[in-house]
């Protein structure tokens, strides 16, 4: 007969690695070309003037300047870079 209890099993005990999403440069802050402004899943924010979008929906600056957030009439959030 066994003198130790069985090990048992569980379906818990896993967690995914952090993805560090969110806004990396706030409105009014100065950025250089290529700087990441927002890391996101899906297009919560869309690129405006002088901003680009990566394949993972990351918004980045195309020129040196200041970050400007704006809303359109149909509730879209755009990010512009105002050249300095």
UniProtKB/Swiss-Prot annotation:
One of its GO terms (molecular function) is structural constituent of ribosome. InterPro entries: Ribosomal_bL27 (IPR001684), Ribosomal_bL27_CS (IPR018261). GO terms for biological process: translation. Residues 1-29 are annotated as: Disordered. PROSITE patterns: RIBOSOMAL_L27 (PS00831). It comes from the Bacteria. Keywords: Ribonucleoprotein, Ribosomal protein. SUPFAM superfamilies: Ribosomal L27 protein-like. The keyword Transport does not apply. GO terms for cellular component: ribonucleoprotein complex; ribosome. Belongs to the bacterial ribosomal protein bL27 family. This is Large ribosomal subunit protein bL27. It comes from Chlorobium phaeobacteroides (strain BS1).
């Amino acid at each position: 007969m066994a003198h130790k209890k069985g090990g048992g099993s569980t379906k818990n005990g896993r967690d995914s690695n952090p993805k560090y999403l969110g806004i990396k440069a706030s409105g009014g802050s100065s950025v250089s070309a290529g700087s990441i402004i927002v890391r996101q899943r899906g297009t919560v924010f869309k690129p405006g003037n002088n901003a680009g979008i990566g394949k993972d929906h990351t918004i980045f600056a195309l020129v040196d300047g200041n970050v400007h957030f704006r809303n359109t009439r149909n509730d879209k959030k755009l990010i512009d870079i105002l050249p300095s």
